[in-house]
Structure formats: structure tokens, C-alpha cells
């Protein structure tokens, strides 16, 4: 990488700051009215004087918590990505925007999982995601006519300038705040679009269709084991009804026999003595879920080559084994509840509601083993098709099993983990997870999937 001379670098930042100042005046009147020294005058002085910026310790620091930052950034990123992807007719381009969205959500999840203090979590998430988002926006503007690209260019220029200005944020008082993100989003969103930082867990059929997932999954049937134990915010949500505009692709169909099996398993909290009956029944449900998902994905134009059908089916069974020991519920402190990890993954397939918000009904993920299984199978199909196969993971060592290993690595850790299983230097905990999964996958491949019974210990957690 060629480094700019110091003077040239300062000039670049100065131009970026000047551009952002212009955009602030046009698009961020609230910021322009703030009392106190003009931060851009401070920038100009710093650039003229040279040397390192001196932080203004009198200026209060932002007070956005990690949780607030994760939700605010997710809301912003989702609205911008959804708008940008909707401007493109290229399915591959849309998948790149989905990659940006999922990566940004995993950034938020990692932020929440870490105990390390982060002084400005919203700024951290902006810096992590902008370098992924900006190139995709820039490429999209080249594919659109000038009028359609105009608002995206405005967002790009403002975002790039804000990114450059972060080098001086302590000195000039230009933190990444919720209001900053609102004004950036409003550069591209239509008038009357509402608060671009509004965050909820409701199902969004538009989001599913935009990224090739098709209509919402069949409605969840909450387990009678839970009674009223689910939080009120997760109560039955009927936003899954498919509007006429979304009825064209074929939904995932569940035959009556499989539906009856799912209802039976959904009201079953197995003990060790139940395993000879419970495990074969769950195997049937998982196999039928994999087969139905395979067919449904084909019907919406997301097919995978037939030679990978068996691999995919084995992948679904082994992932459910790895994630939950084929269970949806456990009894904890005398109360039946969905299996949930420390960072919020839930149910049979340990699906993250935060990562997949908008794609799935959260109450269904928590309260219906069949719904959770269908969601996990759909996510695995996406990662197998659009990541492991698309990026030719099997070609590295010539081993088709690497497709399963790569798919699970992404399922477990997010898009940035695709090839972690073959990296010589890897965190010990991730290496252990990948090794554990491979053992289970190979057992399923050899027809030994009922060995899942060995992990039933009566404990309250899946692992």
C-alpha cells in the first residue's frame, strides 16, 4: 500500500472535512445549530499547525451503551442496505449487501459478548462496517442512472468524510451519534419513512424476498410446554401473513404427517428413558425438514447441485446435534424454557434472533421446534450455496467434507469465519468447536447419528 506524504494526507482529510461540512449544512441542520466552537474551524487550525490533535477533555463523551449501539447501528445498516439492495436488479450484488448486513450484525453480537469496555461503541461499529458498505455502494452507483445514484453518492460522500474525520474526533467533537446516523440515512430514504433508527424484531417479508429467501416460513405453533413463559415482547406475532405481492414464490410446504410429528415433538421434554423413541422421531423431523427446505429453495431459484443433497441433509442433522443435542427445550430451575446460549442463540438450531431479525418470527424460534428447525435449515442452505460452494471451499484440499466444515464455521461465527477451520493459527476455543462439529458430521455421514444420545446428561444447557 502506498502511503500519502503527510502534507498530502492532511489535504485529503481537509477536503473530506470540507465536503462533510457542506453536507452537514445541507442535511444536518440540527448539528449546524449546536452552540460552541465550530469543529471545522478546529480542523482547519489543526491542519495548518501540524502535529497531533489535542483532545478537548471538557467535551462530554457520548453515553450510548453497548446494547443501544448494537441496536442503533443494526437499524441504520438494515435501512440503508435494504434501500440500496432494492435499487439493484443483480442477485449477486444483493448477496453482497446481505453479506454487509450480516457482518455488521455479527459485529454487534461480538460487541455484546465481550466484557471489555468500549468507550464509543457506536463509533466502533460504524468504523467496522463502513469499509464493507462503502465499496458496495460505490459499485452500485456505477450501475445506476445518474438520478437514481444521486442520493447514494451523497450518502457515500458524507459517510467517507465522517470516516476520515474520526482521526480528529477527540479534538473536534464529531462523534458518531444517533442523530448523525439519522441524518445520513435520510440522505437516501424517502420522506416520511419514519425514524431510520427504529429497532424491532418483527418479521419483514420484504427483507426475505429481497435477499432470495422467499415468503415467510409457515406459521409457528407455540409449544404447550411453555404456557405463558415467553416474554410479552415475544408473544404471538401475526405479521407472518403473506401479502398478495409476496405470494408468487412457493412457500415451504409441510405434509400432514410431518406436521403431526412436529406437534408431538414440540410438546415433548425428553428424559433419558425416552431416548429410544424420541431420537428416531427427531431424526425423521430433521431429515424431512432438510428435504422440504431443499425443494423450497429450488422453487425460488436458489437451487444447489443435486450431488450435494446428501451432504446438506447430513449438515442439518450434525448442526442440530452440535448446537442443542436435538433439543428445543430444557427444564431450568423447575421451569421449561427454550435452550438459549449466553449471547442469545435459541432453540434446536441455536438461531440468533439479533442476527436474523426480520427474516424469522422470534416467538416461533423460541417456542416451536419445527419452526426453529426450518429456520436453521434455511440458513445452512444459504451458507452452503452462497458461501462455501460459491467460494469453492472444497477446491482447496479436494475434499467435499470441507464444504460442510466451512458452512458450519459461518453458521457458528458469521461470514468472516468461512475458512477458519483450515487456518493454522486459530483461537483454541474455535478450533475445539470445529473439531467437535467434524466428529459429529462424520458420525452422521456414517449413519451413526443416533449417537447424539450420548450428550443427553440432564444438564440445563446444550453443551
Predicted stretch roles:
Residues 335-362, 372-382:
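Substrate-binding/active-site groove segments that recognize
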Amino acid at each position: 500500500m502506498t502511503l500519502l506524504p503527510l502534507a498530502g494526507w492532511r489535504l485529503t482529510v481537509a477536503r473530506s472535512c470540507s465536503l462533510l461540512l457542506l453536507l452537514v449544512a445541507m442535511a444536518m441542520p440540527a448539528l449546524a445549530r449546536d452552540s460552541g466552537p465550530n469543529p471545522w474551524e478546529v480542523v482547519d487550525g489543526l491542519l495548518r499547525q501540524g502535529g497531533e490533535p489535542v483532545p478537548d477533555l471538557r467535551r462530554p463523551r457520548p453515553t450510548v451503551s453497548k446494547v443501544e449501539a448494537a441496536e442503533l447501528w443494526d437499524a441504520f445498516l438494515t435501512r440503508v442496505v435494504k434501500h440500496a439492495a432494492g435499487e439493484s436488479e443483480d442477485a449477486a450484488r444483493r448477496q453482497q449487501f446481505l453479506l454487509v448486513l450480516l457482518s455488521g450484525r455479527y459485529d454487534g453480537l461480538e460487541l455484546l459478548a465481550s466484557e471489555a469496555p468500549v468507550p464509543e461503541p457506536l463509533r466502533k461499529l460504524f468504523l467496522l462496517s463502513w469499509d464493507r458498505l462503502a465499496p458496495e455502494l460505490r459499485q452500485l452507483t456505477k450501475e445506476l442512472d445518474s438520478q437514481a445514484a444521486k442520493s447514494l453518492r451523497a450518502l457515500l460522500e458524507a459517510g467517507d468524510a465522517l470516516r476520515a474525520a474520526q482521526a480528529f474526533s477527540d479534538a473536534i467533537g464529531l462523534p458518531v451519534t444517533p442523530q448523525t446516523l439519522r441524518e445520513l440515512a435520510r440522505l437516501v430514504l424517502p420522506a416520511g419513512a419514519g425514524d431510520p433508527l427504529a429497532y424491532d424484531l418483527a418479521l419483514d417479508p420484504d427483507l426475505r424476498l429481497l435477499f432470495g429467501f422467499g415468503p415467510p416460513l409457515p406459521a409457528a405453533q407455540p409449544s404447550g410446554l411453555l404456557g405463558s413463559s415467553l416474554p410479552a415482547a415475544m408473544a404471538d406475532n401475526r405479521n407472518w401473513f403473506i401479502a398478495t405481492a409476496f405470494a408468487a414464490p412457493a412457500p415451504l410446504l409441510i405434509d400432514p404427517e410431518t406436521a403431526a410429528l412436529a406437534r408431538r415433538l414440540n410438546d415433548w421434554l425428553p428424559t433419558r428413558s425416552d431416548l429410544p423413541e424420541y431420537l428416531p422421531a427427531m431424526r425423521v423431523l430433521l431429515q424431512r425438514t432438510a428435504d422440504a427446505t431443499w425443494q423450497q429453495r429450488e422453487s425460488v431459484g436458489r437451487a444447489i447441485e443435486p450431488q450435494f443433497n446428501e451432504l446438506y441433509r447430513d449438515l442439518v442433522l450434525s448442526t442440530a446435534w452440535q448446537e442443542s443435542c436435538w433439543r428445543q427445550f430444557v427444564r431450568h430451575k423447575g421451569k421449561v424454557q427454550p435452550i438459549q446460549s449466553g449471547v442469545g442463540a435459541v432453540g434446536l438450531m441455536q438461531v440468533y434472533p439479533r442476527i436474523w431479525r426480520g427474516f424469522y418470527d422470534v416467538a416461533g424460534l423460541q417456542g416451536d421446534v419445527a419452526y426453529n428447525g426450518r429456520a436453521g435449515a434455511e440458513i445452512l442452505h444459504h451458507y452452503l450455496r452462497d458461501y462455501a460452494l460459491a467460494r469453492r471451499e472444497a477446491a482447496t484440499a479436494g475434499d467435499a467434507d470441507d464444504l460442510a466444515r466451512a458452512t458450519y464455521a459461518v453458521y457458528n461465527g458469521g461470514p468472516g469465519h468461512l475458512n477458519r477451520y483450515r487456518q493454522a493459527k486459530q483461537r483454541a476455543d474455535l478450533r475445539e468447536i470445529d473439531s467437535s462439529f467434524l466428529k459429529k458430521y462424520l458420525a452422521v455421514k456414517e449413519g451413526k447419528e443416533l449417537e447424539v444420545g450420548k450428550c443427553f446428561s440432564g444438564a440445563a444447557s446444550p453443551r
